Amino acid sequence: MNVKKTENALSVTLKNFIKSESFGGIFLFLNAVLAMVVANSFLKESYFALWHTPFGFQIGDFFIGFSLHNWIDDVLMALFFLMIGLEIKRELLFGELSSFKKASFPVIAALGGMIAPGLIYFFLNADTPSQHGFGIPMATDIAFALGVIMLLGKRVPTALKVFLITLAVADDLGAIVVIALFYTTNLKFAWLLGALGVVLILAVLNRLNIRSLIPYLLLGVLLWFCVHQSGIHATIAAVVLAFMIPVKIPKDSKNVELLELGKRYAETSSGVLLTKEQQEILHSIEEKASALQSPLERLEHFLAPISGYFIMPLFAFANAGVSVDSSINLEVDKVLLGVILGLCLGKPLGIFLITFISEKLKITARPKGISWWHILGAGLLAGIGFTMSMFISNLAFTSEHKDAMEVAKIAILLGSLISGIIGALYLFVLDKRAALKK
């Protein structure tokens, strides 16, 4: 299969995903820059105070709510992880992760891209209070990485874009596992049993192919609360909920009805404005077309713009702001070096070496249309950790270790920026060299 066939095989969903994520990456970057500017301006006290503002309602002596920062990190980010879970489920069932042959190469690449950065960080920070931050450089920000790769346009093979997307999805799955295993404290088993009960009810609804999203979302709120109270980060509940959303589509009767409506519309007279009959037909077509979509597709379609243009930019604005002044101890343990080297060196080396070895051992096969030089370029772009790395840094370091958290955020910004610039320049030069050889 050549590159052209690969491009033709790229689904409409994947193309739309690339477009939305690439623009989202640029918007994300602007919000991160704005956060740094505000955090180092005369507005910095107001900026930091804003995120600690309690938001909720009072019932007697009880306050139900969180600080604005917790609403973003625990509640809104749960919606982001719900979308991530839906993407992972879709890829596992129908996409690039749906078979061992398709999934093995990007999954192994993601594994190498997580292990190497984690080991680099842990080696530099072993036996220090900051060693728990090894998960920070293990993540990849798909929005930023795709934003960079889309700016390069046709200079990058479509097959490489597909590989990077699949790698990032597998990386997200790995990040979820890391959060569940290593950033969970003080487990409360009674709440875990409650969460398990909710999951069983969701599984029954899925088995019965209940297509309305309302019961899933209502139970999802209950699941989020149980998981939040159990000591596991609540975003894990969102991923579990995503895997319970049905993916089956209804019978073909809706297709016949759509065809009949289309014929009726074609038979109506055309004019400058739509007639009442035409409007009614189009409304019916819209309803029937929506009914043909699976609940998973409907929810993913709804969440994609909210996540890309509201949740993630807001998360970036709330978390990327670090006041860079003389009070920051950049030498706290080796957090700065561990994160930067993990992202800029560990990611590309881990991805390149593990895929190279696995192909030589005939465990996996490199996708057609991608050279080893391309794999190295994708590895460099995978070093853009940003939002996922920021999220893990919030889990790894508590307020008692605030210095390490602030240094980690500076390191994430620097490491992601370096990876993005070097990766883009590398792929640009690679394309120029290939053009000169032709």
Curated annotation (Swiss-Prot):
Presence of the UniProt keyword Transferase in the record: no
Keywords attached to this entry: Antiport, Cell inner membrane, Cell membrane, Ion transport, Membrane, Sodium, Sodium transport, Transmembrane, Transmembrane helix, Transport
Membrane topology: Multi-pass membrane protein
Pfam families attached to this UniProt entry: Na_H_antiport_1
Gene Ontology MF annotations: sodium:proton antiporter activity
Gene3D superfamilies for this protein: Na+/H+ antiporter like domain (1.20.1530.10)
A single GO BP: regulation of pH
Subcellular location: Cell inner membrane
Source organism superkingdom: Bacteria
Key word Manganese present: no
InterPro entries: Na/H_antiporter_dom_sf, NhaA
Catalysed reaction, written as an equation: Na(+)(in) + 2 H(+)(out) = Na(+)(out) + 2 H(+)(in)
UniProt family annotation: Belongs to the NhaA Na(+)/H(+) (TC 2.A.33) antiporter family.
HAMAP family: NhaA
Physiological role: Na(+)/H(+) antiporter that extrudes sodium in exchange for external protons.
Full protein name: Na(+)/H(+) antiporter NhaA
Species this chain originates from: Helicobacter pylori (strain G27)
